[in-house]
Amino acid sequence: KNMITGAAQMDGAILVVSGADGPMPQTKEHILLAKQVGVPNIVVFLNKEDQVDDDELLELVELEVRDTLSSYEFPGDDIPVVPGSALLALEALTEKPAMSAGENKWVDKIFALMDAVDSYIPTPERDTAKTFLMAIEDVFSITGRGTVATGRVERGTVNCGDVVEIVGLGDTREVTVTGLEMFQKHLDESVAGDKVGVLLRGIQKDDIERGMVLAKKGTITPHTKFESQVYVLSK
């Protein structure tokens, strides 16, 4: 469920597959889940290239990955596939954190991977003009400060001091946004696309949970009847 929760908020993904072992059962499961929750673009990293002595074997793994992606309606023939070794790149960067391109072939492959991400996965247009809406992914408490709800802002903007509604399970409740934080930086405003922690006053941790939403007052109403599409994964 954690994979689904995270994937549902992604603009794109890097699929990591062992170049030595090829796609595993969980690889196909992750591709399926990415498709069902609407991840629009995928870039592939063939890890552990250093453990593969035969270039033809690595090519076969790449073909298998492309075929698997195509079978789940991703454009397997067009998706960038970058081989490399995350471990050797990490070891090199640990020794020399400020390494530049051209100094180490394994680090260069990580640069190539990120270039592929930048070129293949487009920057999405953010819907900042509509009213604020954020699906709650997780909740925790900060002693002496209040309750924090985390998630991605789906649309609109939210500012410190705004009064918003918590909608979902139970009665709709009003709360005040007293703080915003993203990547350990405090913000005055958060906009659509931000993965943010929202500090709330007027509610306890036990009264809010994953699946509920934060929204501008009066813009969202809960429903008890709806149509849905359900995918059941067999073990």
From Swiss-Prot:
Record's keyword annotation contains Aminoacyl-tRNA synthetase: no
Any GO MF annotation of the entry: translation elongation factor activity
Compartments, record wording: Plastid, Chloroplast
Keywords of this entry: Chloroplast, Elongation factor, GTP-binding, Hydrolase, Nucleotide-binding, Plastid, Protein biosynthesis
Pfam families hit by this protein: GTP_EFTU, GTP_EFTU_D2
Binding-site list for GTP: N47, K48, E49, D50
Gene3D superfamilies hit by this protein: P-loop containing nucleotide triphosphate hydrolases, Translation factors
GO biological process, one term: mitochondrial translational elongation
Highest taxon, organism lineage: Eukaryota
Catalyzed reactions per annotation: GTP + H2O = GDP + phosphate + H(+)
Main localization category: plastid
Enzyme Commission no: 3.6.5.3
Gene Ontology terms: cellular component: chloroplast; mitochondrion
UniProt entry tagged with the keyword Hydrolase: yes
Segments forming domain tr-type G: 1-125
Enzyme class: hydrolase
Disulfide-bond pairs as recorded: none
Family matches, as InterPro entries: EF-Tu_GTPase (IPR050055), EFTu-like_2 (IPR004161), EFTU_2 (IPR033720), P-loop_NTPase (IPR027417), T_Tr_GTP-bd_dom (IPR000795), Transl_B-barrel_sf (IPR009000)
Family affiliation: Belongs to the TRAFAC class translation factor GTPase superfamily. Classic translation factor GTPase family. EF-Tu/EF-1A subfamily.
Function in brief: GTP hydrolase that promotes the GTP-dependent binding of aminoacyl-tRNA to the A-site of ribosomes during protein biosynthesis.
PANTHER family: ELONGATION FACTOR TU, CHLOROPLASTIC (PTHR43721:SF5), ELONGATION FACTOR TU-RELATED (PTHR43721)
Protein name as catalogued: Elongation factor Tu, chloroplastic
Organism: Mantoniella squamata (Unicellular alga)
Gene expressing this chain: tufA
